[in-house]
Amino acid sequence: MKALSVIHSTTSTDAEIPSTGSTKLVQQVCTTNPLHTTTSIDNHHADCTDGTAYNVPIQTSPPRKRYRQCGQSPSQHLQHSNPSIPSIPSASVDPGLCGVRTNSENCNKRRNHCGSQATPVIHLQGDPNCLKCLRFRLKRNCSHLFTQVSSTWHLTENDCTRDTKTGIITIHYYDEAQRNLFLNTVKIPSGIKSCIGYMSMLQFI
């Protein structure tokens, strides 16, 4: 086996080493930074056929951070970073299944947005005596234009006191067509306010 003498230094060092029939020039560079240590070897045998194993460190760099593009949603960024994750459609929920009004500018208050279990109603607010007289006339002359009418009721504050002196009655209808017929037939007195809406029908056991 050939004797090999290596001179270590913090700077470049050239050493001539005698050998049989040839002179080998070994250059070894050692730096103080272990992350960027490189070793260069000059030998007559470029394919390292002299039986000596050389370990040359390979410098690696950390993976680059992927930045999200401006205007890109988190789901799209996640889909772009990992193609194996399926994309989520923006309109995957049917608004008709949950009774949510999607158009904020829709002013059609006579349309049912609460599901099929709600019944169309009209709330009438005004003086309690006027509401009682109106309810009596409706039962006597227009009973075919609604299904039920409530007694006079009112709203209270959290301390169980009335917020106003006005009363409210609620009129129920079979469907929207019957309610529209009621509105086109019955004239609401000027001192009474009306509010169109829907209410869920409760079944008491």
From Swiss-Prot:
One of its GO terms (biological process) is regulation of DNA replication. One of its GO terms (cellular component) is host cell nucleus. It holds the Pfam family PPV_E2_C. Belongs to the papillomaviridae E8^E2C protein family. It is found in: Host nucleus. It comes from Human papillomavirus 42. This is Protein E8^E2C. Residues 7-20, 70-82 have a biased composition (Polar residues). Plays a role in limiting the replication of viral DNA in keratinocytes. Recruits the host NCoR/SMRT complex to viral replication foci to mediate repression of both viral replication and transcription. GO terms for molecular function: DNA binding; DNA-binding transcription factor activity. Residues 1-20, 59-87 are annotated as: Disordered. InterPro entries: E2/EBNA1_C_sf, Nucleotide-bd_a/b_plait_sf, Papillomavirus_E2_C. Keywords: Host nucleus. The keyword Cell inner membrane does not apply.
